[in-house]
Amino acid sequence: MKERSSSPGTPDSGRRARPKPAKLKMTVQYATSTREPLPSRALLRKWVKAALAHDAEIALRIVDEEEGHRLNRDFRNKDYATNVLTFVYRDGQIHPDSPLGEKRGAYPLTGDIVLCAPVVENEAGQQQKDLMAHYAHLTVHGVLHLQGYDHQEDEDAKNMEETETRILAWLGYEDPYAGYQLAEAVDCG
């Protein structure tokens, strides 16, 4: 088996030299009372690093449906809980409610990723997906949004989907879009 020298999130420079791995400062918060298993901090970190192409400071929060609904309503004007939300902070602007608080370091990417446990669990069941595989997919999806990926246009959606699929395969997970379109598999806007 070929040794993996870097994550698939790392841009390919075309050179043989091993790319320098992205530095990550990450805070994880569990704010849900779900009875289903939640990904460990180590798994979340592994998934984030696999998708990361730049040094980053990220707060990842797993929430209940009430908080997920409130955040989606307040920040996106969508009156329902969604599976993943990504908040990117530029030019040192951090939302006052961010788990990062005022402790922003010298990282070029700073942001929050919020996963709504009940929505993730429900989707995994409806789509007959392994729960941890679905958490991995949505974590990677959020990290790609943090780095500027989006899926508003068809070509952008295709690029994001291919990148997610490649990263998840590298992590040992199946194609999350097999049998689905992006809008069906990931409902983040």
Curated annotation (Swiss-Prot):
The annotated regions of Polar residues compositional bias extend over 1-10
Lineage, top-rank taxon, reads Bacteria
Mind listing the GO molecular function terms for this protein?
metalloendopeptidase activity; RNA endonuclease activity; zinc ion binding
Which UniProt keywords are given for this protein, alphabetically ordered? Answer: Cytoplasm, Endonuclease, Hydrolase, Metal-binding, Nuclease, Ribosome biogenesis, rRNA processing, Zinc
- Region described as Disordered: 1-23
Q: For this protein, what is the EC number?
A: 3.1.-.-
Task: Please give the function described in this protein's UniProt entry.
Answer: Single strand-specific metallo-endoribonuclease involved in late-stage 70S ribosome quality control and in maturation of the 3' terminus of the 16S rRNA.
Family, per entry: Belongs to the endoribonuclease YbeY family.
Q: This protein is called what?
A: Endoribonuclease YbeY
Q: What is the lineage of its organism?
A: Bacteria, Pseudomonadati, Pseudomonadota, Betaproteobacteria, Nitrosomonadales
